[in-house]
């Protein structure tokens, strides 16, 4: 089991390409998406494709719930679009890091790069709790990855980097 970071998340194509990459690699993807995506006729389709709706305004126990479910699986990849949106932002969402830390599983970096028309998997990061050091590794990997729409890329940075190490739950 792993947390698969899908970045840079810059277009609607990212979703389909990342799912295809996960399936081709023999992983069973479970991906997190905003709950609005699951409204109406798309709900059963997105659920069948491994979707898990997220209320971004009230995430509550999402990290603990996903971590508990993920810890029991072996070929499962929890796919997280770390930027949380296709638009350029200031920070990545920290859920991918917190899920991996809580479930005691590695973070696998994956990418799509529009300028080179390539995609694939990068290094595996084992979260140490030193968020800044771990994010330095992640930033180094994504430095030359532009996404399908490079102008929408968000630099990998978490608000948590300024704080103390992230504690692990008991």
Q: What are these model-derived regions, one by one?
A:
Residues 1-144, 148-149, 157-162:
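Soluble catalytic domains of membrane acyltransferases
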Residues 160-170:
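C-terminal amphipathic helix plus adjacent low-complexity
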């Amino acid at each position: 089991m792993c947390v698969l970071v899908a970045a840079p998340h810059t277009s609607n194509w990212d979703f389909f390409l990342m799912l295809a990459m996960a399936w081709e690699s023999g992983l069973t993807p479970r991906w997190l998406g905003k709950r609005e995506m699951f409204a109406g006729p798309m709900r059963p389709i997105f659920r069948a494709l491994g979707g898990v709706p997220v209320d971004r305004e009230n995430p509550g126990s999402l990290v603990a719930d996903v971590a508990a479910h993920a810890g029991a699986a072996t070929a499962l990849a929890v796919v997280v679009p770390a930027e949380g949106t296709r638009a350029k932002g200031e920070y990545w969402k920290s859920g991918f890091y917190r899920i991996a830390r809580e479930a005691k599983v590695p973070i696998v970096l994956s990418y799509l790069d529009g300028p080179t028309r390539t995609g694939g998997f990068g290094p595996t990061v084992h979260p140490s709790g030193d968020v800044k050091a771990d994010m330095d590794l992640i930033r180094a990997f994504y430095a030359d990855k532009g996404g399908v729409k490079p102008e929408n890329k968000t630099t990998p940075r978490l608000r948590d980097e300024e704080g103390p190490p992230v504690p692990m739950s008991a």
